[in-house]
């Protein structure tokens, strides 16, 4: 039988620092939307970088989001953390610089947000968005 237990605060922070990929959940008008997402964790806040599109429209309409991060060795050995909070679009220079430094450290190529798709069909650059999630609720589970 598989035994699952709560993760400590420290274990959750370690997992968020060790990983850089999760699933961002948001909702608009009662419709959920979940997307894979690269992120960075600075020990306090989570940051993510994306191009304008469906997820930014959902977040602009309802900034309450959750980020689920996992580490799976096999079906019997895994850890998972769920972070709930508000996504705040960053616009202040100092905040943007701090967030981008954290993100580039974890994901130097900024993929997949920066790719060939950052140009529209007319060759114009697509707008980008940078967000911070301040964790309000954090839960974690692991197998033992």
Feature locations, PLM:
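Extreme N-terminal tail/first-helix region
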Residues: 1-18
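Charged, gly/pro-rich active-site loop segments
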Residues: 2, 75-144
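Structural motif corresponding to alpha-helix initiation and N-cap regions
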Residues: 9, 52-53
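Amphipathic alpha-helical interface surfaces
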Residues: 12, 55-58, 95-99
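Short secondary-structure boundary/capping segments
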Residues: 13, 38, 56-57, 73, ...
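Short beta-strand segments
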Residues: 19-51, 67-68
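Helix-adjacent hinge/juxtasegments
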Residues: 48, 54-81
């Amino acid at each position: 039988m598989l035994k699952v237990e709560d993760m400590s605060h420290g274990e959750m922070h370690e997992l968020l620092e060790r990983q850089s990929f999760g699933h961002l959940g948001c909702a608009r008008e009662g419709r959920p939307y979940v997307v894979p997402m690269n992120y960075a964790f600075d020990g306090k806040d989570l940051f993510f970088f994306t191009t304008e599109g469906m997820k930014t429209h959902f977040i602009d309409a309802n900034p309450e989001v959750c980020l689920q991060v996992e580490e799976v060795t096999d079906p019997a050995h895994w850890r998972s953390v769920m972070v709930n909070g508000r996504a705040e679009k960053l616009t202040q220079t100092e905040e943007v610089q701090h967030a981008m430094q954290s993100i580039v450290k974890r994901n130097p190529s900024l993929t997949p947000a920066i790719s060939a798709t950052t140009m529209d069909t007319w060759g114009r650059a697509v707008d980008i968005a940078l967000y911070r999630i301040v964790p309000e609720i954090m839960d974690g589970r692991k197998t033992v």
